[in-house]
């Protein structure tokens, strides 16, 4: 199979040049595994953190927060606080129990990952603005958010600082 190399450029705040891509089948060129190492030398995956998008490079701080959790509501609050401070206190943060129904319309997502506590998977979003509606149970054990927002019951409208 002949490989085609195409240089690509991505604009994200400032123009970033991405290395030329090589297109091949998955068997010839499997996708790389994301492995980020925390300050304690373990990887994000070792502590149950799955990172899908990390524009800000904050996965390590969040992974460290996961390791220190001792109870469920503390775990959720710690993910929220760690995400907020790791992102430079410039973005909104939502941590949500993904076993519950929700609706989100988030803009400018800078980070998305998921973390597991006692078999429960939580989504972690760091973003610019938008709305999030919790269609399940509330409370610190199920969701936490921080940033600039107006809340009306189970719907939170986030705005930029």
Swiss-Prot record:
Q: Report whether Signal shows up as a keyword of the record.
A: yes
Which keywords does the record carry? Answer: Signal, Stress response
Signal peptide boundaries: 1-26
Induction behaviour: By phosphate starvation, via the alternative sigma factor sigma-B.
Q: What is this protein called?
A: Stress response protein YvgO
Organism lineage: Bacteria, Bacillati, Bacillota, Bacilli, Bacillales
């Amino acid at each position: 199979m002949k490989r085609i190399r195409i240089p690509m450029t991505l604009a994200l705040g400032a123009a970033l040049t991405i290395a030329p891509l090589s297109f091949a089948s998955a068997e010839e060129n499997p996708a790389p595994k994301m492995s980020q190492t925390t300050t304690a030398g373990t990887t994000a995956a070792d502590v149950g953190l799955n990172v899908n998008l990390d524009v800000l490079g904050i996965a390590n701080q969040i992974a460290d927060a996961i390791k220190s959790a001792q109870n469920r509501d503390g775990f959720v609050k710690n993910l929220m606080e760690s995400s907020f401070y790791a992102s430079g206190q410039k973005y909104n943060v939502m941590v949500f129990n993904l076993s519950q129904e929700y609706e989100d319309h988030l803009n400018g997502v800078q980070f998305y990952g998921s973390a597991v506590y006692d078999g429960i998977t939580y989504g972690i979003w760091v973003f610019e603005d938008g709305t999030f509606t919790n269609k399940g149970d509330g409370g610190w054990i199920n969701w936490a958010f921080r940033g600039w927002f107006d809340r009306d019951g189970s719907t939170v409208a986030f705005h930029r600082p």
